[in-house]
């Protein structure tokens, strides 16, 4: 019996963020692909000045010496449970939040760095 697209979407919607990360990794391995965004060439000719990036991804690069404080900060920022936050922190580098505004990204970066983490905005 083949699954319908609707059944697949419902199954994915029920998964946690950590389970989705594992699923994406499994897809990458099985199909030998990368989930990284494809770079698009800028239009040639009289292109206007490059627009400032409006959406950022907050990436936890390293948790540093104070892992417990970083886990607490991650839980606070993402709403994840203790185990999910711990797994995310220990799996660094990991993207914590995607598509956030520059202000929200900078605020989250500041909180995590105060807890001892190394964070980058991309």
Swiss-Prot record:
Lineage: Bacteria, Pseudomonadati, Pseudomonadota, Gammaproteobacteria, Moraxellales
GO cellular component, as recorded: cytosolic large ribosomal subunit
Protein name: Large ribosomal subunit protein bL12
Biological process terms in GO annotation: translation
Family classification: Belongs to the bacterial ribosomal protein bL12 family.
Keywords, sorted A to Z: Ribonucleoprotein, Ribosomal protein
Function comment: Forms part of the ribosomal stalk which helps the ribosome interact with GTP-bound translation factors. Is thus essential for accurate translation.
Subunit structure: Homodimer. Part of the ribosomal stalk of the 50S ribosomal subunit. Forms a multimeric L10(L12)X complex, where L10 forms an elongated spine to which 2 to 4 L12 dimers bind in a sequential fashion. Binds GTP-bound translation factors.
């Amino acid at each position: 019996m083949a699954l319908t697209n609707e059944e697949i979407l419902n199954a994915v919607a029920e998964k946690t963020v950590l389970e989705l990360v594992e699923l994406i990794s499994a897809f990458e391995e099985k199909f030998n692909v990368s989930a990284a965004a494809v770079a698009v060439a800028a239009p040639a000719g009289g292109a206007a000045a490059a627009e400032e990036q409006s959406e950022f991804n907050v990436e936890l690069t390293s948790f540093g010496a104070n892992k417990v404080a970083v886990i607490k900060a991650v839980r606070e920022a993402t709403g994840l449970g203790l185990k999910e936050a711990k797994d995310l922190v220990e799996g660094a580098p990991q993207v914590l939040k995607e598509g956030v505004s520059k202000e929200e990204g900078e605020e989250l970066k500041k909180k995590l760095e105060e807890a001892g983490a190394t964070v980058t905005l991309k």
